[in-house]
């Protein structure tokens, strides 16, 4: 069966969320995008939508999943439904330093200042980060976003 590597860093990192749209997806390993920052941009609903921007000195962690090609359309529809489109051209790097081409989605909107992450997105990101054992510092950073007084 043909499949596609998918890098999840936002709400579809949550094992329940990805299983809803791609029941055949299997988690392979954790990885990161070097020189990349997690941002939250305005979405159609006006909430902080997770996305990525290239920026030195930052790293974004996530999980790489093997998604059956027959389910890529449903995953794409779900990501687009949240306001993201395919199009991140940076290779994900695993813990051994290997680089991987992955299907990755970023917000349609360009970064336009700092926005508070939407609670549902952030909760899913934290659940997934904990579940897949992403680095503790990354998980703590996500948790801190929900407690940041600048976003209150």
Where do the language-model regions lie?
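Glycine-aromatic micro-motifs
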Residues: 1-152
């Amino acid at each position: 069966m043909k499949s596609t590597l998918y890098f999840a860093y936002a709400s579809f990192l949550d094992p329940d969320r990805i299983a809803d749209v791609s029941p055949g997806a299997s988690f392979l390993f954790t990885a990161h995008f070097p020189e990349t920052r997690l941002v939250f941009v305005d979405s159609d609903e006006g909430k902080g939508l997770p996305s990525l921007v290239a920026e030195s000195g930052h790293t974004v962690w996530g999980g790489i999943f093997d998604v059956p090609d027959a389910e890529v359309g449903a995953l794409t529809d779900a990501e687009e439904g949240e306001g993201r489109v395919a199009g991140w051209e940076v290779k994900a790097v695993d813990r051994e330093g290997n680089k991987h081409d992955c299907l990755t989605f970023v917000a349609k909107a360009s970064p336009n200042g700092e926005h508070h992450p939407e609670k549902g997105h952030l909760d899913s990101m934290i659940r997934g980060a904990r579940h897949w054992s992403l680095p503790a510092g990354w998980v703590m950073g996500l948790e801190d976003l929900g407690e940041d007084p600048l976003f209150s």
